[in-house]
Amino acid sequence: MTGVADGIGRALALAFAKEGAQVAGCSRGTERLDSLAKEIEGSGHIFFAADLSQAEGVRAFFDKVQEAFGGVDALVNNVGAVLKLGNFFEVSDEDWENSFQVNLMSAVRLCRLSIPALRKSSCPRIINISSIAASHPQEIFPHYNAMKAGLSNLTVSLAQTLAEDGICVNTISPGPVWSRSWEQEVEAQGSGPSAEQAKKDIMEQTGKSIPLKRMGMPEDLTGLALFLASEQSSWITATNFTVDGGLTRNPF
């Protein structure tokens, strides 16, 4: 499981561990991984700091997983980042390349490494965390939108390739979910009452356009992810699940 230090990834790691899974989690920094290791239920989990935008980082994480567990039952590709805010004219070639490596190639490389181990599992699953930005892109951060669309397409392609192995591959596409990036925006307001008000204002303003009238929280995705990783989802593959409080209103 990647991107576990904050937000959706952290919530997923905690939820999977609560259900008895042994979690191998990766993120770039060590401080938040250390706090997760103290909070998570159960034992035998491993947490590894690596830069998954680099092939060497992906390989190092996978080797650590194999050394600790000797196999993989479910791969959750969650790591992702906007990296650069801006419209098409404000995003450079370097920004596009960085987004490609973080948001798409990290998943490609981990899938490639994990598939041989997944073939040996009795309940093999790949879950890619994309975004509604893949299907409903806005003007801002086109590089991120495009890479998330690529990740969603990778899901469908891989699902067909791996169907004969019984490996189910699905996508979860969240809408606006409170995460570290939103927290950083609040932190920019300083501490104390002003920061709390900034958080409240952001959540209220964002929630206005959502039929359920609130932003999502990371925990809103955990039930679906657990289901997709379970034996109960054995006839579900190549599917994109939108979790956005009804924001995109897509009937198909």
Locations of regions flagged by a protein language model:
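Conserved glycine-rich cofactor-binding loop
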Residues: G3-D6
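Conserved glycine-rich Rossmann-like NAD(P)H-binding loop of the short-chain dehydrogenase/reductase
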Residues: E19-S35
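Short C-terminal tail/terminal secondary-structure segment
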Residues: V82-L85, H136, L226, T237-F252
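Substrate-binding pocket helix/loop in short-chain dehydrogenase/reductase
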Residues: G86-F88, S92-F100, T206
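Active-site helix of classical SDR
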Residues: C111, M147, T155
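Alpha-helical segment proximal to the catalytic Tyr-Lys
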Residues: P116, Q160-E164, S234
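Residue(s) in the substrate-gating loop at a strand-loop-helix junction
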Residues: S131
